[in-house]
């Protein structure tokens, strides 16, 4: 299957058209609607390649319903969005607006609802779609509009399009970077299991094509586990770091900020800040190329592979990163997996369930460190709870929703059922979406990540649907995929898809996998292995795996947009290799090199074609 949306790649785009855009200051207070209880909603027209519903009847019917309703509202939505964008091509969100700005921005807000084209719109016909952008298909139900959002669902889609040139510019005072450094030394520097969850203050400008969005007082903190580094090395040279951005941080928690806690004089403005989102996101992650993938797109391509299998996966894009005017090179930007993520992909009836991040931990259910590290193997002795990063308390299953109300009963029931020696088909299907599971495991096999649910019992999310209580899995942190072996050489291209072993060569521990898709599958669940085999066959016949063409097309688009900024302004203290664009690889390079995508694809297809259940 070809990668949707790659035809007619735009090539290199200009990121600065300031002379052609109008500058409007929209204050936070004006963004607070006087009709907050308005039941209006915006239609999320996300293309099928950009959003991936689970393959269940409920989700399919929701998609169909949304498509029918969108026919009535698509013209209105596109007109309103077009006018809003023409006004807000450069949008500045101020932390504490003046009354004058509030009045001006209220006028802008009102005028933006009038369906008249701007001067730039008169030069083209908005209703005609460029050939490079296929007609989007609505695949998700509506969610309520957020009057405090910047950019909306249209920006959400454009932000992660590989064809668009994106830049993230962070402006942060030295006093704040010093606090980031102190946060690291206070927590992670003494115990690698701990890390600070305190956000420091920065201003942010995001450019998408020729549109620019500036947001004041964005929260920023460093992120990562073993990859987490201090902001500065001991010699004062900057490290290249990964970051988490928060768009709704209020900076007024005295326990976290002490005497520097922000004092809000306008309660309305504070409430607006708590609801502020950017491109419908509460947060956004920024990660550097820690595995030195010279194609710079493998994780993005893998996400497209999962989408083609109708598996839930976060949106991932590329962006230039600069901090205080210094070019930090090319990074990846990520949609977080949270309530917003689920709302975009599942029908309303499925929302409200428990969401868990599944990782390695040495904690028991009491939050005590046992010294025995283990992955999320789905055994009954795995731990679960609400993590506390500042205390280094993490569980195998870290609850991300319903933190105050959940009794974890869905998870406990799930673990008990899948670990029964004589579990029946009816019992398993009561707690597991079998069709979705087969698709998830098939796509995971071809992605070839040695650090995933099957090979290292790590890096995925587990969600229990509210409507039927069934478990589905969500892809996460696939940065070691499609032939990336740098730092962890467990070549998954040679693994039999039905193997009873993990990539570590140890016997498979996950009871779901053992019972359903391996050589050890019992007669009771042979039908699941057949579903898995069918999904493997479907994926193996798609253009994404039978040819390098789609991958090379995406690569050339990324290279065209970002080759000029791939080299950072300085060699970072923790940088081990140069950053570059290249399709070359070395499959015999050990853990200091990556095989090429061509080598990986060829090898895993050879392994698959010669395998037998």
Predicted regions and their residues:
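Sec-dependent signal peptide cleavage junction
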Residues: 3-26
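Regulatory N- and C-terminal appendages and interdomain linkers associated
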Residues: 3-5, 9-11, 133-222, 556-613
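Short, well-structured beta-strand/strand-turn elements
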Residues: 309-321, 453
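Conserved oxyanion/phosphate-binding beta-strand-loop segments in alpha/beta enzyme cores
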Residues: 204-288
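Internal "kinase-insert"/substrate-recognition segments embedded within catalytic cores
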Residues: 249-252, 268-283, 288, 309-314, ...
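Middle-to-C-terminal accessory/interaction subdomains
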Residues: 144-149, 165, 178-180, 391-396, ...
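Extracytoplasmic intrinsically disordered, low-complexity "stalk/linker" and propeptide segments
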Residues: 47-51, 56-61, 65-136
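A conserved alpha-helical element in kinase catalytic cores
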Residues: 290-311
């Amino acid at each position: 299957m070809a990668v949707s949306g790659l035809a007619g790649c735009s090539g290199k785009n200009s990121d600065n058209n300031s002379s052609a855009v109008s500058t409007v200051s929209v204050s936070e207070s004006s963004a607070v609607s006087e009709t907050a209880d308005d039941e209006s909603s915006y239609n999320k027209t996300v293309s099928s390649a950009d959003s991936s519903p689970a393959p269940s009847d409920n989700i399919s019917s929701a998609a169909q319903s949304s498509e029918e309703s969108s026919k009535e509202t698509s013209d209105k939505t596109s007109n309103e969005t077009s006018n809003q964008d023409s006004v807000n091509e450069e949008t500045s969100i101020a932390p504490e607006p003046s009354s004058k700005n509030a009045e001006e921005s209220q006028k802008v807000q009102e005028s933006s609802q009038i369906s008249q084209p701007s001067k730039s719109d008169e030069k083209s016909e908005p209703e005609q779609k460029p050939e490079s952008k296929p007609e989007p298909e609505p695949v998700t139900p509506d969610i309520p509009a957020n009057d405090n959002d910047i950019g909306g669902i249209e920006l959400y889609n454009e932000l992660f399009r590989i064809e668009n040139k994106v830049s993230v510019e962070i402006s942060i005072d030295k006093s704040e970077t010093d606090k980031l450094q102190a946060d690291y030394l206070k927590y992670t520097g003494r115990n690698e299991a701990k890390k600070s969850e305190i956000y420091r203050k920065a201003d942010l400008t995001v450019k998408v094509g020729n549109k620019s969005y500036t947001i004041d007082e964005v929260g920023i903190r460093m992120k990562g586990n073993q990859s987490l580094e201090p902001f500065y090395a001991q010699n004062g040279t900057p490290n290249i770091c990964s970051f988490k951005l928060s768009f709704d941080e209020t900076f007024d928690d005295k326990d976290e900020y002490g005497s520097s806690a922000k004092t809000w004089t306008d309660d309305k403005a504070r409430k607006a800040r708590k609801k502020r989102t950017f491109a419908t996101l509460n947060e956004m992650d920024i990660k550097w190329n820690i595995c030195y993938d010279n194609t710079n797109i493998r994780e993005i391509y893998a996400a497209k592979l999962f989408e083609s299998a109708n598996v839930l996966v976060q949106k991932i894009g590329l962006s230039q990163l600069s901090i205080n005017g210094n070019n930090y090179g090319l990074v990846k930007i990520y949609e977080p997996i949270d309530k917003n993520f689920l709302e975009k992909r599942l029908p309303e009836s499925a929302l409200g369930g428990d969401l868990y991040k599944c990782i390695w931990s040495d904690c028991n259910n009491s939050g005590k460190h046992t010294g025995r590290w283990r992955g999320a193997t789905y055994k009954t002795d795995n731990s679960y709870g609400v993590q506390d990063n500042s205390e280094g308390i993490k569980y195998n299953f870290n609850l991300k929703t319903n933190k105050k109300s959940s009794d974890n009963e869905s998870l406990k029931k799930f673990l008990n059922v899948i670990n029964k020696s004589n579990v029946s088909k009816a019992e398993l299907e009561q707690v597991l979406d079998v069709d979705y599971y087969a698709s998830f495991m098939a796509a995971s096999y071809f992605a070839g990540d040695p650090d995933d649910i099957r090979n290292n019992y790590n890096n995925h999310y587990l969600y229990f649907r509210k409507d039927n209580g069934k478990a589905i899995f969500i892809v996460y942190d696939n940065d070691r995929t499609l032939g990336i072996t740098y730092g962890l050489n467990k070549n998954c291209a040679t693994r039999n898809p039905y193997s009873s072993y993990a990539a570590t060569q140890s016997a498979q521990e996950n009871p779901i996998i053992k019972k359903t898709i391996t050589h050890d599958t019992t007669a009771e669940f042979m039908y699941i292995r057949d579903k898995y085999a069918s999904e493997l066959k479907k994926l193996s016949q798609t253009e994404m795996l039978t040819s390098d063409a789609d991958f090379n097309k995406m690569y050339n688009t990324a290279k065209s947009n970002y080759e000029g900024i791939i080299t950072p302004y300085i060699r970072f203290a923790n940088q081990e290799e140069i950053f570059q664009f290249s399709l070359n690889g070395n499959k015999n390079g050990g853990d200091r090199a990556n095989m090429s995508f061509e080598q990986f694809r060829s090898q895993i297809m050879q392994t698959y074609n010669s395998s037998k259940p």
